[in-house]
């Protein structure tokens, strides 16, 4: 009998922790990202910021906007604008579905994390709905309660 293939943890490069706090994530999609030669070197070094980023569907193409990838320190002439829009590589039906979902009021696409998979940079895009302030407080209260329960269980054993 063949052994089960164990999945390695993703080679995580960056994570957008603020997105989980500010948004309710409805669905996620994995997308490739079109990068230039020096950009991929900076990404592999972990020199990127997803915090203010978002994705947009334009002309039946998905674009990642407002994501900062620092210029590669050795790239000089070949470096590009750190804040440029980057194309997301998705199937046509996925782009069409995302376009329909984001057409609703209050729904947006946010990058959740960027990682390497088989040598290629991938972005996990979340279809997100904005939280209200009372929702954020409610989430924090629930997390505090869960933490207290875990402490009590840990002290018990």
UniProtKB/Swiss-Prot annotation:
GO terms for cellular component: cytosol. The keyword Secreted does not apply. It is found in: Cytoplasm. One of its GO terms (molecular function) is RNA binding. Keywords: Cytoplasm, RNA-binding. Pfam families: SmpB. The keyword Cytoplasm applies. HAMAP family: SmpB (MF_00023). Belongs to the SmpB family. This is SsrA-binding protein. It comes from Lacticaseibacillus paracasei (strain ATCC 334 / BCRC 17002 / CCUG 31169 / CIP 107868 / KCTC 3260 / NRRL B-441). The lineage of its organism: Bacteria, Bacillati, Bacillota, Bacilli, Lactobacillales.
């Amino acid at each position: 009998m063949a052994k089960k293939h164990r999945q390695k943890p993703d080679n995580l490069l960056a994570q957008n922790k603020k997105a989980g706090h500010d948004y309710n994530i409805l669905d996620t999609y994995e997308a490739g990202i079109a990068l230039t030669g020096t950009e991929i070197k900076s990404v592999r070094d972990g020199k990127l910021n997803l915090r203010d980023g978002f994705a947009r569907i334009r002309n039946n193409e998905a674009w990642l906007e407002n994501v900062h990838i620092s210029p590669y320190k050795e790239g000089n002439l070949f470096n590009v604008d750190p804040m440029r829009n980057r194309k997301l590589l998705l199937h046509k039906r996925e782009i069409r579905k995302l376009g329909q979902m984001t057409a609703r009021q209050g729904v947006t696409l946010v990058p959740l994390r960027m990682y390497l998979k088989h040598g290629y940079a991938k972005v996990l895009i979340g279809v997100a709905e904005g939280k209200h302030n009372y929702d954020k407080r409610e989430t924090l209260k629930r997390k505090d309660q869960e933490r207290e329960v875990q402490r009590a269980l840990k002290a018990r054993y």
